[in-house]
Amino acid sequence: MNDLLDPIRGIPVDLELVRRELDVDLPTARYLVRTGLITTDGARVLRRGPTTGTCATAAAKAAAIRLLEGRTVRTVRVRLPVGTVIGVRISRVGGDPSEARVRKPGSDDHVDVTTGVTIAARVEETGSEGVEIRAGRGVGETPSGKPAISEAVREQIVDNLRYLVDSYGVGLRVTIEVPDGEEIARKTLAHRHGIEGGISILGTKGLVDPNSEEAIEGSIRSDLRYVERVPCLVTGYRTMDRARRLGIPSRDIVNCHGRYDLALEAVKTGVPADGEVKRFDAVLIFGMPGKLLKLAAGAYNTHAKVADARRESLVTRLVEIGRPDLAVEAARHEGLISEFLRSLDPDVRRELFERVCELVEERVSSDHDLECGCALYFRADDSEEVVEGEGWKRLVRGYDDDLIGRPKG
């Protein structure tokens, strides 16, 4: 068997291609693929790098080992949210309180201003139990005043420090810092999301996917080769996981990274597979409000550098459902779009999301001559909402009845 499943994308990776292109033996190729550090997009082998969250976790673990065991480590093993374990190199350990630093590696084809940035963690004992996580200089602050450290990263740090906390019976305070964070943040789009004072510490899966246009298009076309029924376009790992929980098979889920233009063109024109051209006449789109508001407005490339019509689309959609009063509030709202959406009455929010799904289905069907089903995923406080368009309901029923989605030869 020359294929292993990519733990991030859930599709086969050609081990022989990896071994040949990287000039490594087969066990090394297996390790690189199993950890998620290496993936492929057709004939190309691509390297993933750790997220800011994984680097922060590695720094915290190295600092905690020095504090509790008196050892200085140069590499630490970090468990990723996806479940695999990778080694991360530590650039410096020392200080009082104990501090460690990681210089963030990059990934192939990924234009990322955080590549090469230093991420530091200070660790101190506390009188309480568990792990307390704080933000220091260079880590941004959200409009609500909270540190811009995602929940997934917080869970990753706690998961990787748990054995030390349990073994030594202590509580730990971890402070994450990015010495050049404020300067780097000026080069990012953080301010558009209301993040001030530094960068966000993020990472849903723990590894950064390559995302140049060439790499994204290659990844989309590679994923489409394995689709058995209807391609379900998602925009990231959060929507990918949620789509799986809705019952969409992993092989049918395609991460388009917000590039609906590239994905829909590939779905329509087809991709080479087993000596034939695999085409589809239907597509599912599953996303969160930010991306789908843009898509409803006709922005098929939803990257923030290209299109940021979320607020305008939100205002228009509210008018369309007969709530001009809320449209005015949305136009004046200075915080995050997600915060405004959480403030809405649940019934109004559902009506709004149904309208967004309806527009996406109509637009994609009209512009690309594809039967389209759209569903929207939203997290409101501690609960989750999934709103399905009529096209989605029809196509997913067909899934169950084995009526639709078979690729056309």
From Swiss-Prot:
Signal peptide from the UniProt entry: none
Gene Ontology terms, MF aspect: cobalt-precorrin-5B C1-methyltransferase activity
Domain of life where this protein originates: Archaea
The entry's keywords: Cobalamin biosynthesis, Methyltransferase, S-adenosyl-L-methionine, Transferase
Pfam families found in the cross-reference section: CbiD (PF01888)
Enzyme Commission code: 2.1.1.195
This protein's pathway: Cofactor biosynthesis; adenosylcobalamin biosynthesis; cob(II)yrinate a,c-diamide from sirohydrochlorin (anaerobic route): step 6/10
Disulfide bonds: none
Gene Ontology biological process terms from the UniProt entry: anaerobic cobalamin biosynthetic process; methylation
Catalytically driven reaction(s): Co-precorrin-5B + S-adenosyl-L-methionine = Co-precorrin-6A + S-adenosyl-L-homocysteine
Xref: NCBIfam families: cbiD
Family label: Belongs to the CbiD family.
Name under which the protein is recorded: Cobalt-precorrin-5B C(1)-methyltransferase
